[in-house]
Amino acid sequence: MSLPGQIQSAIPSLPGFDCDTTLTASLAQKFFAQGYKFCLRYVSRGAESTQDVSQQEATDILNSGLALMPVQHVRKPGWSPSQSLGEQDGQNAVTNAQGVGFPAGVSIWCDLEGVDRTVQPQDVTDYCEAWFGAVNQADYIPGLYVGAGALLSGQQLHDLSFQHYWRSQSRVPDIPIRGYQMIQLFPSIQINGVAVDLDVVQDDQQGGQAQWLQVDVGP
């Protein structure tokens, strides 16, 4: 069963948030009433857990007026990326997004951070390209969250197949020519009893935009 709503390009300057907490319908409505316009919720690297976004939660979020995109959980700091792991994680991101009901064309974000510092940049590149390939093949829009310890330079990030980048609140490199489509703000805060990171969307330097799912709730 597909989620309600349509794929839309993110509108520059709109505020939103990402969180690792299940949002009830009333919580989602409260965030929307406070002026937030979108949120990102997590899907797993494997079987979905109770903390990951469910179809019911996603429906409640969308019906509140908030736009929605999924982001995949990252491993604990010190993990070692590889091509095979990227393919596995990408396929699981697709499976879990489809299970929730996200339609093709929505942005799914890969969380790249906390990589083992002894890993070679090529291993990170191989992971990212394999993840991109699995998600892109399923007709989703692969996006890359660049967090602390991603290990790649701005140029190396730009050289990836990704065309959608999300800048974390950590000190991370600028991406030449393209830049970022979403900016995570510092610090993390609590709103409505929920720990969140605030985000703002923008067009990147090539005019690219994140693609989210949204229900038109009217005036």
Residue ranges and their predicted role:
Residues 1-21, 28, 33, 156-219:
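Functionally critical loop-and-helix segments that line ligand-binding/catalytic clefts
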Residues 124, 152-157:
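Active-site-adjacent substructure of cysteine-protease-like catalytic cores
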Residues 41, 70, 144, 166-167:
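Structural beta-sheet core signal
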Residues 135-153:
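Aromatic-lined carbohydrate-recognition surfaces of secreted/lumenal glycan-active proteins
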Residues 65, 139-141, 162, 179:
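A generic structural signal for alpha->beta connector loops
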Residues 77, 151, 189:
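Flexible, glycine-rich phosphate/dinucleotide-binding loops
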